A protein has these predicted regions:
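An N-terminally biased module of ancient metal coordination in phosphate/nucleic-acid-related enzymes
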Residues: 1-88, 173, 194-197
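Extended substrate/RNA-proximal surfaces in nucleic-acid metabolism proteins
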Residues: 42-165, 213-227
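Hydrophobic anchor at the start of a short beta-strand
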Residues: 36, 138, 186
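Charged catalytic cores and adjacent phosphate/nucleic-acid-binding surfaces used
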Residues: 1-6, 10-14, 21-26, 91-111, ...
């Protein structure tokens, strides 16, 4: 089995990402990881105000380019890289919290993103129904963080039961209880933003090489989670 990061942000994808792809590749190699999923924030405020590209497709191209850059540098260390999202349905935000609800999405492809622009304009239910048709998994990240809104369990495949962000109060134990109560998939992620932030993920078989294989493994197997600082969250 190999270690796989499920929640990772890069510099250039948002205001909060601080590490460049070259740094990310070296740090994950040093930590013994053989796979990562790049899950930069995918939200209206970033696409409308942070990204400088003019058209929606140009913005998607830029978003994908961040993943490709991580893939380039990780390839030098033999680390597999998958494309993901941390998607914020804009309708779930509040005047005091944005993003108030985010979903880690696995199995997305470049063609899917180009063919389905402005995903953040859809409701949770609309997203779930669209993803079901396209073999994409949708799991709420850090659902019990203090400012977050809990999504409808009927319209998600799972939740992030361990979020390793070092400065947030994630109440991960509540996420575990929620997943068990609603028979949802539970995953773990570091929520990596900067150097020193690696402490989560899952174990994968060595032969998982495509996004399709990643999704099917998560769907059909009991996952072994990486939770380095579980007692502190």
């Amino acid at each position: 089995m190999i270690k796989c990061e499920m929640h990772l942000h890069t510099k250039g994808g948002s205001y909060c990402g601080q590490s460049m792809p070259r740094e990310i590749a070296q740090e994950y190699f040093n930590a013994g990881y053989k796979a990562v999923v790049v899950t930069n924030h995918y939200m209206k405020s970033l696409f409308d105000y942070y990204y400088t590209q003019r058209t929606e497709k140009q913005k998607v191209k830029y978003y994908i380019s961040l993943y490709k850059e991580v893939k380039k540098y990780c390839g030098e260390y033999g680390i597999k890289v998958f494309l993901g999202l941390e998607l914020n349905p804009d309708c779930m935000n509040t005047p005091t919290a944005s993003p108030a609800a985010e979903f880690l999405c696995y199995g997305v492809t470049e063609d899917f993103l180009y063919g389905n622009l402005r995903l953040y304009d859809l409701t949770q239910q609309q997203l779930y129904e669209l993803f079901e048709k396209n073999n994409i998994l949708m799991l709420q990240s850090h659902p019990f963080r203090s400012y977050c809104i809990l999504g409808d369990p009927r319209y998600m495949h799972g939740v992030e039961v361990y979020n390793g962000h070092p400065t947030q109060q994630n109440n991960n134990y509540k996420s575990e209880q929620f997943a068990e109560e609603h028979h949802l998939i539970g995953i773990s992620g570091s929520d990596y933003h900067a150097r020193g932030g690696i402490d989560g993920g899952i174990y994968l078989p060595h032969n998982i090489n495509t996004d399709f294989e990643l999704v099917n493994y998560i769907k059909n197997n009991k996952l072994k989670l990486i939770k380095v600082n579980a007692n502190e969250s």
